[in-house]
Amino acid sequence: MHLHRHLPVVKPLIAALALTLLPLSARAEISFSVSPIRIELSGEQGGTHTDAMEVRNEGNEKVRIKVSMQDWYLSEEGTPIFQKGGTQAHSCTGWMKINPVDFLLQAGEKKVVRYSVAIPAGIKDGGYWGAFVFETVPQVVPGQKTKAVAIKGNIGSIVYIVVGKPVPAGDILDMTYDARKGRKILTKVKNTGTVHFRIKGNIKITDTAGKTVQTTDLPDVPVLADSSRTIPVTLDDKLPAGGYTAVATVDIGGKAVLSGEFPFVVK
């Protein structure tokens, strides 16, 4: 039994570090890319998947790269936070393998690394996630003495796995108006199911006469199982003072579309 791969449209991610902390004699540009940066798989218990990734040295110096499998989660604002593999309840890092895990890349060189995923038998249906983290290892030149701080770059290639046929479920917990740093409508979405989903939909702003004065698409962002995410939408800066209603329509891929309304006043 095999896993099915869903290919998102994602550009390769490049980590470029300007080593401004180094003395002039030690400065060099470290830059590398990994593709793909998001892997989406689906399958049943006992399913397997094998594929490849490409790592390219975009800099002008050779780099040593180590690869590890790590857990991660998102803050309510969407910031990814990485942890040791096996920490999170929905971790799939124990199912993931990659080869090689330590290699050198000359300037301009690219390397194909192969990975595999094996879903354990008996695992519950639901969503699971992890990451292949590619990290540069500082090169130490024998006999060289420097007070420079070691600079490292890393790129996480995110892995999502859907086991079985779990149904996305969620709710809009809250909508607020925030005028502190630009006028924004903040919509808090809660994932109440066992599988991650991505946000689709929009925020529509109507005036007191019911006329639509602004419609803005929501960003295509993930909300992980057992978590909440606050989605900001910036209001038109030409919106005059007065009373308005924000109407949220959020498609999470389940059977129902989430909706919510929030009256607010622009001063």
What is the predicted role of each segment?
Residues E29-V63, P100-F103, G170-K184:
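Beta-sheet-dominated interaction scaffolds and their linkers
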Residues A52-R56, L186-T192, T234:
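Short edge beta-strand/loop segments characteristic of extracellular beta-sandwich folds
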Residues F103-K111, D220-S228, A256, V266-K267:
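Short proline/glycine- and polar residue-rich coil/turn motifs
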Residues I39-L41, N99-L105, D174, D217-V223, ...:
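Beta-strand-rich interaction surfaces with strong enrichment in secreted/lumenal proteins
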Residues T50-E54, R64-V67, K97-V140:
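Ligand-binding face of N-terminal immunoglobulin V-set domains in extracellular IgSF glycoproteins
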Residues I30-P36, N60-Y115, K200-I203, D207-V213:
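Surface-exposed binding patches on compact interaction domains or structured appendages
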Residues Y128, F132, G242-A248:
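A short tyrosine-centered beta-strand micro-motif
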Residues G59-E61, A121, P138, N191-V195, ...:
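Short, acidic/polar linear motifs in exposed loop/turn regions
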